[in-house]
Amino acid sequence: MKVEEKAGVKKLEPTSYRRRHPEQDFPSIHIGFPVPGYSQRKSDSKGHLSGLQRVQWSLQPDKSQQDLAGPDGIKASSLGGSVDFTKRIRSPAAEQLQDILGEEDEAPNPTLFTEMDTLQHDGDQMEWKESARWIKFEEKVEEGGERWSKPHVSTLSLHSLFELRTCLQTGTVLLDLDSGSLPQIIDDVIEKQIEGGLLRPELRERVSYVLLRKHRHQTKKPIHRSLADIGKSVSTTNRSSARSPSAGPTLHHSTEDLRIRQSTSYGHLCHAQSRSMNDISHTPNTDQRKNKFMKKIPKDSEASNVLVGEVDFLDQPFIAFVRLAQSSMLGGVTEVPVPTRFLFILLGPSGRAKSYNEIGRAIATLMVDDLFSDVAYKARNREDLIAGVDEFLDEVIVLPPGEWDPNIRIEPPKKVPSADKRKSVFSLAELGQMNGSVGRSGASAGGGGSGGGAGGSGAGGGGSGNEAEMPAMHEIGEELIWTGRFFGGLRLDVKRKLPWFPSDFYDGFHIQSISAVLFIYLGCITNAITFGGLLGDATDNYQGVMESFLGTAMAGSLFCLFSGQPLIILSSTGPILIFEKLLFDFSKANGLDYMEFRLWIGLHSAIQCLILVATDASFIIKYITRFTEEGFSTLISFIFIYDAIKKMIGAFKYYPINTDFKPDSITTYKCECVAPDTVNTTTVNDSALLVPNTNMSVYTPLNLTALDWSLLSKKECLSYGGRLLGSSCQFVPDLALMSFILFFGTYSMTLTLKKFKFSRYFPTKVRTLVADFSIVFSILLFCGIDACFGLQTPKLHVPNVIKPTRPDRGWFVAPFGKNPWWVYPASILPALLVTILIFMDQQITAVIVNRKENKLRKAAGYHLDLFWVGILMALCSFMGLPWYVAATVISIAHIDSLKMETETSAPGEQPQFLGVREQRVTGVMVFILTGISVFLAPILKYIPMPVLYGVFLYMGVASLNGIQFWDRCKLFLMPAKHQPDHAFLRHVPLRRIHLFTLVQILCLALLWILKSTMAAIIFPVMILGLIIVRRLLDLIFSQHDLAWIDNILPEKEKKESDRKKRRKEVHENTDKEPQFLPPSVVKIPMEGIPSDPQNGIHCVGRKRSSSWSHSL
């Protein structure tokens, strides 16, 4: 088949240098790529180019050296040499792609499910058999069994892509065809082929007969059908063997066999009128509707069908690419009941089955490519499709055949590069292709990714220009803009949050919310009990466990109902506990009333918080970069981990392991209760006393002298003044070891069940359910283990009566009457420290929660959050309850428990993180349950405390995930060759990274020392000190380094942005036409690739160079 040039395909002969072999003269592939001129500054190359600059694929015959100079006088030296030129190379394909892909107003195109069917012959019968399918990655039908292969990355030969390009150039292309059935589509395609002289009219019925054969799909069959098929296949094989002892498999693929059998089959076409030409049903069959694979296909998807095969009656390929105007159900053509939008048909002469199959795989792979699928949907003509293929060729990676086995299936990557990056690349300065850039940018590939694949460049790939290597600027949301108006920020927060208020409730009705509520509830009550007990010891029970429970329930529920960020969980913190202890000691030493003094400090602090809200003081949070965020969150995580381990070690001290126990001396071990020397003979009425083996009522008055002290229990003996005597009296079962099993078992089981989501066992929904309820399952499991053993491990004790811990105080604190008048104004000074502490804790936690990595779509409310924290502080001060502020670790755990991922993902594709389920229901339910925990005390008393310590440990460890500081700390222990491919490691020297990490470690150590001493009262001031330290780092590190390992401070960002803007204006005024080097040329001999003119699919040779000369 002769390859003809089509309209709109222009011949472009770039000026290039080519080195000729002294003894050979043969056609060559010239792979050219434009290089930015060296006279132009690199920093000026970004964003000033129009058109899509592409890698140029050009097949041209050898020319004399004089012809290479070009009509414009452009001269080229050897590859990589400096070249002067004055004209920019622009390709028609670049303009086409820029026009059709530049429209961003349209809705995204549906996901394409692509199925490839190959023509199979069984005797006189023919059918289309499904051989492969794609959603994102390729799945093949295994030849040795009725099963699908694992999803894998499609590996295509470069030659098949060239042949596909030729197919689109020479075949029939029908765009927006208005047909609703397969016979009608085939009739239109055949008619178009006959009109174009590509098919002889007498072959119409033969081609139509082949294309309308039934399709057999690789679907899962019931077990009874599978056994029946096995028996049928065995009997068929026996009959075939009886007819011909040398007979091969049932399906014949050899050319000779096909020719003989097809001639017999087509001989029956004369009787076509007596039987149907169409074997395909118009509606989906039962197998299609029941196919479970439909769950993997996104909603509103469309299908792309690829049909390839070989026949003996064609002397040139029958090629057609069809795009329907509206997707239509084509009956049994597709494996699943998905409407078809695209068809690619390739029927060719016999003997090239493998070549046709590779071309089919190539077009199928392109159809599921994000960018080419957009081109296919928006293409206006044939040239647009060819331009899409050329863009795909720009991104193709070629592996040397001697270094890679194509039979090895490449596992799908964990992170796939976004197609948006490719779509936005319309200039060479931003080109992040594998083949499109050289020089310095090629050495620093993958600007934004954490790996080669993620960055789009990997090893050996071209990166961006100098400016493109910089990461995204530190984005400051509009919530932190200083308005300059009285309560301006608060009013804007309210306006932003009001539209989302109804959805904050109905978005919470999801099964995932149940797991989040139980997880955070257990963390909150554990924290409330621990903090309440410590606070009771520090304040002589003026504030205890009951006050902690009531304050947590009231403050937390009100905050989650009305705050700007309801995902934040309020709790008490260590610095507040230290402040309360110092305040109580000061009041006691100076004869002041502690509760009244504390009330005035809380009122002043609340007023100061409201002043900060009124003046939009929260805008200074934009100066908190990753350096401060990660230092603060890492410190809180370490506190959780340290406290959990410390409490576990305390169990070993309280219940020591019996190292002196000797099993051989068990007969000498005894313990008995001995009566005291003098016993009061008066009677005792004690309901707790129960003498074993007697019928004595528990309420019967007892005479202690009449008791048999040897029958009393340990508790009874000690309560009535008796003494324990014996060598085994100090024996304690190994409660410490059992507590450790419960503690570490809960932590490790939770961690394992969380990772179970990414295992290979059980269906996706089961794994997701187990991962979401991992905390609940772990707690229930180890509570059951503790109950089975029946050991007296420490249990959770919750007050069962709502009353103040101290009997001489009530639920309201009077503001006057117990302290001198000067105490009221003097409390402003300690209130200032509390305000700094509250402000920093609250806003740093809010910044961490509102990170862009969490993909929160509802607006934040920094001013509204601080407003409610101030109001709640005043309310808690009047009621004598603890003060509450945002809890970093529990808030991060709340975020993690509400993360959403794609419900349907393509086989082999990792679930994509969609964001967080933003709502108020979980927070409100957590604190309501905390409040009614008093009535749940009979149930909660069965929960061992070591289990809750394990939950604490998990919270601390889990909150360290995703912190870059922790990743950089681990680099100290890794050799360079084993270090992960983090993005910052590509752009910042390792010694600079270690220096930055050491500074953070020193700051963290200083904060830890302050927290552990009485100087913890100045802890909030030291948080402010972190911001100062970060500003001083600008004197040590460059802005480039800080951009990768931290964030650039706002004023630095503004200066950088202004500098770029001025430079852009100067560039636009002085240099409207950026210059490029002429394409450098690599000569690839084509002598070993034979052309076969008979089938019409081949690489274009000496006289067909224009078919390939698109400068892309």
UniProtKB/Swiss-Prot annotation:
Keyword ATP-binding: no
Region feature (Disordered): 1-80, 220-255, 439-469, 1055-1112
Pfam families listed in its UniProt record: Band_3_cyto, HCO3_cotransp
GO-annotated molecular function: monoatomic anion transmembrane transporter activity; sodium:bicarbonate symporter activity; solute:inorganic anion antiporter activity
Compositional bias of kind Basic and acidic residues: 1-13, 1055-1074
Keywords: Anion exchange, Cell membrane, Ion transport, Membrane, Sodium, Sodium transport, Transmembrane, Transmembrane helix, Transport
Subcellular location: Basolateral cell membrane; Apical cell membrane
Membrane topology (UniProt): Multi-pass membrane protein
Tissues expressing this chain: Observed in hepatocytes and in the apical region of bile duct intrahepatic cholangiocytes of liver. Also observed in uroepithelium cells lining the outer pelvic wall of the kidney (at protein level). Highly expressed in colon, distal colon, liver, kidney and testis. Moderate expression in duodenum and stomach and weak expression in heart. In kidney, very weakly expressed in the inner medulla, but abundantly expressed in cortex and outer medulla in the medullary thick ascending and cortical thick ascending limbs of the loop of Henle.
Extracellular topological segments: 537-547, 621-734, 793-820, 876-880, 941-945, 1011-1015
Residue ranges of the TM segments: 514-536, 548-579, 599-620, 735-753, 773-792, 821-839, 859-875, 881-900, 921-940, 946-966, 993-1010, 1016-1033
Biased composition (Gly residues): 444-465
Keyword Transmembrane helix: yes
Reactions the enzyme catalyzes: 2 hydrogencarbonate(out) + Na(+)(out) = 2 hydrogencarbonate(in) + Na(+)(in); 3 hydrogencarbonate(out) + Na(+)(out) = 3 hydrogencarbonate(in) + Na(+)(in)
Gene Ontology cellular component list: apical plasma membrane; basolateral plasma membrane; plasma membrane
SUPFAM superfamilies: Phoshotransferase/anion transport protein
Entry-linked PANTHER family: ANION EXCHANGE PROTEIN, ELECTROGENIC SODIUM BICARBONATE COTRANSPORTER 4
Similarity section: Belongs to the anion exchanger (TC 2.A.31) family.
Protein name listed in UniProt: Electrogenic sodium bicarbonate cotransporter 4
Source organism of this protein record: Rattus norvegicus
